[in-house]
C-alpha cells in the first residue's frame, strides 16, 4: 500500500503522498521553484506502520516544491432586500500556492 501523511498548514489539513499536487494557503517569503518544508505532520502511514501524533509526529517532515501561485474559484455574495430596490453583489477570489509533494520523511 502507498505511504501517505496528513499535514497541517494554514489551519487546514491535507492528506498527501509523493507526487501529489495540492493548493495551500499563501506562505510568506516563498518564491517559485523554492522548496517548502511542512513540519506539522499529524499522521503518517508507510505501508505497514501507522504513526499518530499527539498532536505532531516527531521527526516527520514533508517536503514539497513550489510550482506557482494560483487563484481559486470566485465566490459570490449577494445581498437583497425586497421592495426597497436594494441589492449588492460582491465577489472574492482566494490566492493559493500550488505545491508538488516531493518527499515524505517518516
Swiss-Prot record:
In the UniProt record, does the keyword DNA-binding occur? no
Keyword Transmembrane helix: yes or no?
Answer: no
Look up the record and give one Gene Ontology term from the biological process aspect. Answer: translation
- Pfam families on file: Ribosomal_L21p
What keywords are annotated for this sequence in UniProt? Ribonucleoprotein, Ribosomal protein, RNA-binding, rRNA-binding
GO cellular component labels: cytoplasm; ribonucleoprotein complex; ribosome
As one GO molecular function, the record gives: rRNA binding
Q: What does this protein do?
A: This protein binds to 23S rRNA in the presence of protein L20.
Question: Into which family does the record put it?
Answer: Belongs to the bacterial ribosomal protein bL21 family.
Q: How does it assemble?
A: Part of the 50S ribosomal subunit. Contacts protein L20.
| Name the record gives this protein | Large ribosomal subunit protein bL21
Native source organism of the sequence = Chlamydia caviae (strain ATCC VR-813 / DSM 19441 / 03DC25 / GPIC)
Amino acid at each position: 500500500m502507498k505511504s501517505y501523511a496528513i499535514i497541517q498548514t494554514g489551519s487546514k489539513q491535507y492528506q498527501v503522498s509523493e507526487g501529489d499536487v495540492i493548493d495551500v494557503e499563501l506562505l510568506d517569503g516563498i518564491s517559485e521553484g523554492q522548496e517548502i518544508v511542512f513540519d506539522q505532520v499529524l499522521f503518517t502511514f508507510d505501508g505497514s506502520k501507522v504513526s499518530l501524533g499527539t498532536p505532531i509526529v516527531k521527526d516527520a517532515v514533508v517536503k514539497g516544491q513550489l510550482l506557482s501561485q494560483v487563484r481559486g474559484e470566485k465566490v459570490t455574495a449577494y445581498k437583497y432586500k425586497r421592495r426597497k430596490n436594494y441589492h449588492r453583489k460582491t465577489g472574492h477570489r482566494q490566492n493559493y500556492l500550488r505545491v508538488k509533494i516531493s518527499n515524505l520523511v517518516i
